[in-house]
Amino acid sequence: MKKTGLNWWCNRTWIKFLCVIAVLMTGLILMNWNIWSTELKIIAAIVVLIPLHVLEEWVFPGGFHYQYNSFFGSALPDRYPMCRLSDMITNLAATILYIILTAICVIRGEVSLGMLLGTIVFCFLELVVHTVFGIFMYVKLKAKGKTTIYGPGSITAYWGFTVFGVILLYCLEGRTILSSDWIEAGIILAIIAVGCILLPENFLKKKDTQYYFENNGYYDRFLK
């Protein structure tokens, strides 16, 4: 059946939109390469990395939803609790957040310590989450031929978010961190956790949702 409206947008159209944003932000970073600080380049590069991360989770090879929903014990991992609509909102909202943060940094002329801290934690949480999911799925599917802890999103989590996190850690060297910096970091992380993930997922999770995933991507090879 041909998808229309929001169902069409939530299929993969929104991913193409994110990729356009990534290309534009890449151009902006290159144009300001000799002007922007390392910290600002990384904050802006998160806008580029999220679409790449989504491409790995959804398309090449795809199937992140299967490991995510399976981890939370779902009997319907193709649709519950994560569906196409909720994950679209999660990733689009996170991208918009980092566009806003990049704009704030450009206006201020610097990246605040709070923003650095929040982004560092966010980056390393991606590492932890994908490692935990990877181990879980390895244990679950090793009898069916799975031999690694790889899961959709792992490559961009390890070689994208983790690398960015390490670079930003070096940027903290010699700087004094105040309680106000941790508060700012906490606000950013709360927006990501609550606003981008928990609210859309909890509001939209339905076992009879029309926004189900049509295949399990990478995991289909183990489910035959």
Please give the residue ranges for each predicted region:
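Membrane-water interface of transmembrane alpha-helices
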Residues: 54-69, 128-138, 200-207
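Membrane-proximal helix-loop-helix units in multi-pass membrane proteins
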Residues: 97-158
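The first (N-terminal) embedded transmembrane alpha-helix
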Residues: 10-30
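Small-residue-rich transmembrane alpha-helices that serve as helix-helix interface/gating elements
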Residues: 159-160, 180-200
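Juxtamembrane helix-capping/reentrant segments at transmembrane boundaries
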Residues: 68-90
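Short, highly charged, low-complexity non-transmembrane loops/tails of multi-pass membrane proteins
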Residues: 206-224
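Short, hydrophobic transmembrane alpha-helix segments
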Residues: 26-40
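Hydrophobic alpha-helical transmembrane segments in multi-pass integral membrane proteins
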Residues: 157-178
